[in-house]
């Protein structure tokens, strides 16, 4: 049975990371920026799993670290969305350009 080569995983991870980076740098909506940052983090997780499974010395360390990173990312997304909801209630917008002032 043939396995998918490591270059396919790495290419997919690079494409996902570049899409996330482009979205995070060009979009003005805070929710979209958070989603793009999660996409970049998932690309890094894909690299961890690919190197763990197809690396020179395959072991489970990269996969376990990827699961840990996913749980931290879920907590980060929850906190980020909670802060975003609080800012929306205060400013009535989620546009990044409008959130440059610290005082109300």
Swiss-Prot record:
Q: Which InterPro entries match?
A: NADH_UbQ_OxRdtase_chain4L/K (IPR001133), NUOK/Mnh_C1-like (IPR039428)
Which EC number(s) does the record attach to this protein? 7.1.1.-
Please give the catalytic activity noted in the UniProt record: a quinone + NADH + 5 H(+)(in) = a quinol + NAD(+) + 4 H(+)(out)
Principal subcellular localisation of the protein: membrane
- Name the membrane topology term: Multi-pass membrane protein
For this protein, the record's Gene3D superfamilies field holds: 1.10.287.3510
Locate the transmembrane regions by residue number: 4-24, 31-51, 67-87
Keywords in alphabetical order, please: Cell membrane, Membrane, NAD, Quinone, Translocase, Transmembrane, Transmembrane helix, Transport
Q: Name one GO cellular component term.
A: NADH dehydrogenase complex
Q: Does the keyword Transmembrane helix apply?
A: yes
Q: What class of enzyme is it?
A: translocase
Q: Where in the cell is it found?
A: Cell membrane
A molecular function annotated in GO for this UniProt entry is: NADH:ubiquinone reductase (non-electrogenic) activity
One GO biological process term is:
ATP synthesis coupled electron transport
Q: Report the function annotation for this chain.
A: NDH-1 shuttles electrons from NADH, via FMN and iron-sulfur (Fe-S) centers, to quinones in the respiratory chain. The immediate electron acceptor for the enzyme in this species is believed to be a menaquinone. Couples the redox reaction to proton translocation (for every two electrons transferred, four hydrogen ions are translocated across the cytoplasmic membrane), and thus conserves the redox energy in a proton gradient.
Listed under subunit, the entry gives: NDH-1 is composed of 14 different subunits. Subunits NuoA, H, J, K, L, M, N constitute the membrane sector of the complex.
What does the sequence similarity comment in the record state about its family? Answer: Belongs to the complex I subunit 4L family.
Its name, as the record gives it, is NADH-quinone oxidoreductase subunit K
């Amino acid at each position: 049975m043939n396995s998918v080569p490591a270059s396919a995983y790495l290419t997919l991870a690079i494409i996902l990371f570049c899409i996330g980076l482009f979205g995070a740098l060009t979009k003005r909506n805070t929710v979209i920026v958070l989603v793009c940052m999660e996409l970049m983090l998932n690309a890094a997780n894909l690299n961890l799993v690919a190197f763990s499974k197809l690396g020179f010395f395959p072991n489970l360390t990269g996969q376990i670290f990827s699961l840990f990173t996913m749980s931290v990312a879920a907590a980060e997304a929850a906190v980020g969305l909670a802060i975003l909801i609080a800012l929306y209630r205060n400013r009535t917008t989620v546009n990044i350009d409008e959130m440059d002032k610290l005082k109300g």
